[in-house]
Curated annotation (Swiss-Prot):
It catalyses: L-proline + NADP(+) = (S)-1-pyrroline-5-carboxylate + NADPH + 2 H(+); L-proline + NAD(+) = (S)-1-pyrroline-5-carboxylate + NADH + 2 H(+). The keyword NADP applies. Catalyzes the reduction of 1-pyrroline-5-carboxylate (PCA) to L-proline. Keywords: Amino-acid biosynthesis, Cytoplasm, NADP, Oxidoreductase, Proline biosynthesis. NCBIfam families: PRK06928.1. The keyword Manganese does not apply. The gene is proG. InterPro entries: 6-PGluconate_DH-like_C_sf (IPR008927), NAD(P)-bd_dom_sf (IPR036291), P5C_Rdtase_cat_N (IPR028939), P5CR_dimer (IPR029036), Pyrroline-COOH_reductase (IPR000304). Its EC number is 1.5.1.2. This is Pyrroline-5-carboxylate reductase 3. One of its GO terms (cellular component) is cytoplasm.
Length: 272
């Protein structure tokens, strides 16, 4: 019997819990959750899976082989210290928080450590889970975590030094994409008599179809543009504007988000 604990129950924790239960990677009575606020999200889960336990970690942490910390970054170290009396070298602790590096996590415990950055698109089983394992973590624990994540996402192990940039392309990307396409839709509304609902509907289906084509036909962005934009045509005209204007926007996106990651790490470091 493999028992799994979740500490914190936001949208990512809910996605992980539901996917593990849905794919029968764990039984209801093997899942333990601690959350400070037992809100609608947790009540909905327990309505669907009444045998899930929602209790303080002190009641179950010493029985769990895998514990996922799903609290905000500035609460991770505090949570690690609460866990300390209940875990050992055989425990595998996973943090899904941005800005809390392995070195700070490892300093708080003798348990094995991994970092996972999940994506909300894994709700549709179309996301990527970024994974960084501690060098000291046993191979079988790495494999088991990767196996669990792979039932609802594509698992990609990467260098921790690349994790923040990669997170912008996976975990944050749905938000960035939504912001970009919202502005495109609103521009269409300003330049026509289309309703916002019509513009959004057209774009959502175009976005879905483009992603499907890119994956199923293994096409690059460049190939897609070549297929759509004829030389001297209308699409090419619009693409030229985007190529001229957007690089500076995205450079600023990365500059500001990477600085935010750095500030988070500095703040967490002051807690140790």
């Amino acid at each position: 019997m493999e028992q799994i604990g979740l500490i914190g129950y936001g949208s990512m924790a809910d996605m992980i819990a539901r996917q593990l239960l849905k794919h029968e990677q764990i039984k209801e009575n093997e899942l333990f959750i601690e959350t400070r606020t037992k809100g609608e999200r947790l009540r909905a889960l327990m309505s669907d899976y009444p045998n899930v336990s929602a209790d303080p970690l002190e009641n179950w942490a010493n029985t769990c082989q895998l514990i996922l910390i799903c609290v905000p970054p500035l609460h991770v170290i505090e949570t690690m210290r609460r866990l300390y009396p209940y875990v050992n070298r055989n425990t595998h602790i996973v943090s899904i928080a941005a800005g809390v590096p392995l070195r700070l996590l490892e300093a708080e415990t003798e348990a094995g450590i991994s970092r996972v950055i999940p994506a909300i698109t894994s709700e549709a089983e179309a996301g990527i889970s970024l994974v960084v394992h501690s060098e000291a973590l046993a191979a079988e624990k790495k494999e088991r975590l990767n196996e669990l994540l792979s039932v609802f996402s594509r698992v990609r192990e990467i260098k921790e030094s690349n994790l923040d940039v990669a997170s912008n392309l996976t975990s944050s990307a749905p938000g960035f994409i939504a912001a970009i396409f919202e502005e495109l839709a609103l521009s269409a509304v300003r330049n026509s008599s289309l309703s916002k609902e019509e513009a959004f509907d057209f774009l959502i289906h175009s976005l879905y179809g483009t992603g499907k084509m890119l994956i199923e036909k293994n096409m690059s962005f460049e190939e897609t543009l070549e297929r759509v934009a004829t030389k001297g045509g209308i699409t090419g005209e619009g693409a030229e504007v985007i190529h001229a204007s957007v690089p500076d926007v995205f450079d600023e996106v990365f500059e500001r988000t990477l600085r935010k990651y750095e500030l988070l790490t500095e703040q967490v470091g002051k807690q140790t």
